[in-house]
Regions:
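Small/polar beta-strand repeat architecture
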Residues: 95-109, 115-185
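Surface-exposed extracellular loop regions of Gram-negative outer-membrane beta-barrel proteins
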Residues: 285-310
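Surface-exposed loop/turn positions within WD40 beta-propeller blades
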Residues: 85-86, 195, 203-204, 213, ...
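Beta-sheet repeat architectures centered on beta-propellers
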Residues: 1-93, 177-194, 303, 312-327, ...
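A short beta-strand motif characteristic of beta-propeller blades
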Residues: 55-63, 172-178, 215-221, 262-269, ...
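Hydrophobic or amphipathic alpha-helical targeting/insertion segments
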Residues: 186-220
Length: 583
């Protein structure tokens, strides 16, 4: 007979991610039944995700209606290309390196210090938050870089204080127009002749190519006008997805995206299904269809060879195809799949990597009008977003998938509704952009809110019975191990008996981050009145010993985030309890 007077400890790490396909008896303690706006952390635990903020203070100009959404975004040649309505624009963005006070005088001789002046013209206008500045020169010879000859309060704006790291952006410059009825832009960056270029297709008009000076040239061949997909493979440009020939892939001669002379190496390939995406991976071009996947290998038109990967399952949407964790990930009819697993196992369910969150995909695949995806390389993270017409951004859902040593872990996103996306890595900096329905370009992984809207993080543990659901546990305390990055606005809730409404429901307990370890080079000076006191030698992953009330046959832990604090990681919990009577 156990000694019920002794306190029993039960500790677990936060690992395994969101699991919705197992009973409470089979779930591991570290797995979650709710994991919303938290992400499986590559450093262990569950991290409250970053927000996003405007990457440009200026709205992308509309063609005819304010309801026009962003239908294309890409980073190229130190600028961002944005597509809205019938036009394409570019602009430059950076961050403020040194704060500007409201009283600082700038009347033609001011200086603004920024992280980089790359992509900006040598003179022009800038916008920082709501204030417009003009400048007459730039300097990259100093660090931080500088805008010189600055005048503030331009265009009747008012001088204001601007903190470091806020966005500094140029106005938008039109670089192409007349793209009537453009639907959705997809692009490919390439270099065939020593000049970096980018090509766009929009499902309706002729493909357009920009060089690094942003000169626009339309591809003249009518056979590829209206293409939906484009990919560069073995120095040929491949086009597919025309509404009139949805099963055909057309490719150019080598090193020329606008020459389709068959005798010089151009040609076409027809498959027996509607094409939904193209993606180059290693030494092959993968052609995704509604119900098939094909693999093209070879180097020229004389030895190109097509082979089926599977003839029983396809890709629902080409915008979900991403190179991720050493494989190609795509959305199949039964959830997320990898090409390697699908090729090896065929169309069986074993090829699906998202079984743990299958119910989320089942609920969203059927009625989502559009899908978007991004890869965040430094987090080994794939994100897919389910966009539904008429649905508010605040309730738009998505899923994060993180590759860990033990396998894939998942969580749910709520509050991001992208209409176009791009991920670009430059000098180790991962730039994750998306366009929205309001005409703005946003940068993910920046800030603590969704462009001013709170990031509401939610965590719920599995139902913890400690091996025996028949014995009552009298809870004494919960020890929380977490890693804060700044002040925390979150609370712990303890619930009992599978959250039965008749069981004890103690009031919420606030998480305390008042004494966080100071890290040289990253911590700011703190004050006795501040929300966070950085303590030299203090713990960077503190243990909070929280006495709790109540008892039950099983215990549930919840963390509810207030929405505007900096991210933090939940690392693990220890629950201490005494045994009571058997039911």
């Amino acid at each position: 007979v156990p000694d019920s007077s002794q306190t029993q400890p039960a500790a677990f790490n936060c690992e395994g991610g969101l699991v919705l396909n197992r009973s409470s008896f089979l779930m591991k303690p570290g797995e979650a039944l709710v994991l919303e706006n938290f992400e499986p952390d590559v450093e262990g635990g569950y991290r409250r995700m970053n927000g996003y903020r405007k990457y440009f203070n200026h709205i992308v100009p509309q063609t005819s209606s304010a309801s026009e959404r962003i239908i294309g975004v890409a980073n190229f040649a130190n600028k961002v290309i944005a597509c809205r309505g019938e036009k394409i624009y570019n602009g430059a963005s950076t961050e403020l390196a040194t704060a500007i006070t409201a009283s600082e005088t700038m009347s033609g001789s001011g200086i603004i210090k920024v992280d980089s002046i790359s992509g900006f013209t040598t003179s022009g206008t800038l916008q920082i938050e709501s204030e417009i500045f003009t400048y007459t020169g730039v300097s990259s010879a100093v660090n931080p870089n500088e805008f010189t000859g600055v005048t503030r309060e331009a265009s009747s704006t008012t001088a204001a204080a601007h903190l470091g790291n806020v966005v500094v952006s140029s106005s938008w410059t039109e670089i192409d127009t007349g793209r009537t009825s453009a639907s959705k832009y997809r692009f490919e960056r390439f270099n065939y002749n020593g000049t970096d270029k980018i090509i766009f297709v929009d499902e309706v008009n002729a493909p357009v190519v920009f060089d690094s000076s942003f000169n626009a040239v339309d591809v003249s061949e009518s056979a590829v006008a209206g293409s939906k997909f484009v990919a560069s493979f073995k120095d040929h440009m491949f086009y597919a997805g025309k509404s009139s020939t949805p099963e055909e892939v057309v490719f150019s001669i080598p090193f020329d995206e606008d020459d389709f002379t068959s005798g010089n190496g151009a040609g076409s390939i027809r498959v027996d299904d509607t094409i939904t995406g193209l993606k180059v991976f290693r030494d092959a071009l993968f052609i995704f269809c509604e119900n098939r996947i094909f693999k093209l290998t070879g180097n020229t038109s004389s030895d190109f060879a097509m082979a089926p990967v599977t003839r029983s399952i396809g890709c629902l949407n080409g915008d979900t195809i991403q190179e991720f964790a050493g494989d190609l990930v795509f959305l199949g009819p039964d959830g997320l799949r990898t090409v390697a697993a699908t090729a090896k196992i065929g169309d069986t369910e074993l090829g699906t990597i998202s079984k743990n969150v299958q119910s989320i995909f089942d609920a969203n695949i059927r009625d989502s009008a559009k899908f978007e995806s991004v890869v965040i390389a430094d987090k080994t993270q794939y994100r897919i977003f389910f966009t539904k017409d008429g649905q508010a951004e605040g309730i738009t859902r998505g899923v994060t998938c993180v590759m860990k040593a033990e396998g894939y872990e998942f969580s749910e996103i709520r509050g991001i509704k992208p209409t176009a996306t791009d991920t670009f890595v430059s000098a180790g900096d991962v730039l994750v952009l998306h366009g929205d329905n309001n005409g703005f370009i946003q940068r993910q992984e920046k800030g603590n809110t969704f462009d001013g809207t709170p990031v509401l993080g939610k965590y719920r543990s599995s139902d913890l019975s400690f091996g025996d659901t028949g014995i009552r546990k009298h809870m004494q305390r919960v020890i929380i191990n977490y890693k804060p990055e700044s002040a925390i606005d979150a609370e712990l809730l303890v619930r009992y008996d599978n959250e039965n409404s008749d069981s004890t429901r103690p009031a919420a307990y606030a998480l305390d981050s008042s004494e966080v370890a100071a890290q040289f080079g990253s911590a700011l000076f703190s004050t006795t009145s501040g929300a966070v006191r950085f303590v030299f030698g203090g713990p960077s992953q503190p243990l909070v010993r929280q006495p709790v009330e109540g008892s039950g046959f099983s215990v549930v832990l919840r963390i509810n985030d207030g929405g505007e604090s900096a991210p933090y990681s939940l690392k693990g919990f220890q629950l201490e309890y005494q045994l009571g009577a058997r039911r």
